[in-house]
Amino acid sequence: MKRVLVLLLAVAFGHALERGRDYEKNKVCKEFSHLGKEDFTSLSLVLYSRKFPSGTFEQVSQLVKEVVSLTEACCAEGADPDCYDTRTSALSAKSCESNSPFPVHPGTAECCTKEGLERKLCMAALKHQPQEFPTYVEPTNDEICEAFRKDPKEYANQFMWEYSTNYGQAPLSLLVSYTKSYLSMVGSCCTSASPTVCFLKERLQLKHLSLLTTLSNRVCSQYAAYGEKKSRLSNLIKLAQKVPTADLEDVLPLAEDITNILSKCCESASEDCMAKELPEHTVKLCDNLSTKNSKFEDCCQEKTAMDVFVCTYFMPAAQLPELPDVELPTNKDVCDPGNTKVMDKYTFELSRRTHLPEVFLSKVLEPTLKSLGECCDVEDSTTCFNAKGPLLKKELSSFIDKGQELCADYSENTFTEYKKKLAERLKAKLPDATPTELAKLVNKHSDFASNCCSINSPPLYCDSEIDAELKNIL
């Protein structure tokens, strides 16, 4: 766990369990030999907690125990050459039993209909959706030390499991680095003569790594939910809304840059990928946008590159400039092979004119742009555009209007003030509703707004919630 090479092998280990290939077995054995049983177990716990975020501590611990046991046995000198393949196949079969003690993936049942290597590869490919709402709450210093003194090993395992399941989209190397550093702090401070002073000092030292880990989890969760193409669209929308006075030429390279960083770093085994790439990105942000927006300029005055990134990441949408309405691009523009930026231009122009959170705009723009692009594949693209264009424009306008109604007053007010205005609007629309019914509606709508009406709303959760709310809109 102390070197990038080791972490690189750890990623191979994640696949070796399912694949059982000789060359992967050799990597696992080398890893086991280098780390030793204790650190290998810790690394496995982080890896499988991350891979199975819905698994219980007991389920993940049981899987880790089995993996470590088979690795120790099959990597021992004089072990049967078939040991590794036989044991991993048995582990795979055990995962398919109805009373399996191991954590379950969505899709496990389908994988279990397959046999041999095909089953192992199927299980290796299964992924949970990102945990968009981490529930981890750090205990008090006294609670931490009480649990640590009671059973240091059990405390460490529980912490690694809980933290890794909550922040599992952060790169594996970052999770390993942070959890190891955190446990080192606990070990030092809970045996210190002045635990409070010790925790204060050590947390200050850990602040940068903690922030990098949690923020990486957040941006990588969004990337995992959207994929590369839609992430690029999402990043373009956000920047257009934060700095609507900028030009496309200022914003598009930045949207592409952060998308490329996430593509490279979210699954990287290198511990310094995010730590190196994000500061470089903030320099580009400030070079391109600090003169275009006063809030951006303020963010660029922060002391560290990470603080600059956090400031710009959480920056809300700016006030809309007064601009003429934007029209859908023509078939001539869309179908022109030399005009590669036409869809980006439309996305940018619509976004900087529209007071509506990114999750809404990404949801409606992706199918709209795709539908327009499909006209280029038919023989008579002009007729296709003439037929689709007005309908798409009407659907887009209707969706935006409904979305703006759902999020009305949210970003401009405190939450208390927002709920007050929401209650007034609902009362005007539903004069016959009882106070109890109104209160229930206010809570329902405000819960939705608090999760889905800000610039960095969680895309997976909000996708289905937006559908439900639009069906019930008053």
Curated annotation (Swiss-Prot):
Associates with membrane-bound immunoglobulin on the surface of B-lymphocytes and with IgG Fc receptor on the membranes of T-lymphocytes. Interacts with LRP2; the interaction is required for renal uptake of GC in complex with 25-hydroxyvitamin D3. This is Vitamin D-binding protein. The gene is GC. Disulfide bonds join 29-75, 74-83, 96-112, 111-122, 145-190, 189-198, 220-266, 265-273, 286-300, 299-311, 335-376, 375-384, 407-453, 452-462. Changing residue 445 to R: In allele GC*1F, allele GC*2 and allele GC*1S. Involved in vitamin D transport and storage, scavenging of extracellular G-actin, enhancement of the chemotactic activity of C5 alpha for neutrophils in inflammation and macrophage activation. Its main location: secreted. The keyword Transcription regulation does not apply. It comes from Homo sapiens. Allele GC*1S is O-glycosylated at Thr-436. The trisaccharide sugar moiety can be modified by the successive removal of neuraminic acid and galactose leaving an O-mceeN-acetyl-galactosamine. This conversion is thought to produce a macrophage-activating factor (Gc-MAF). Only a minor proportion of plasma GC is O-glycosylated. The potential N-glycosylation site predicted at Asn-288 is thought to be nonglycosylated.
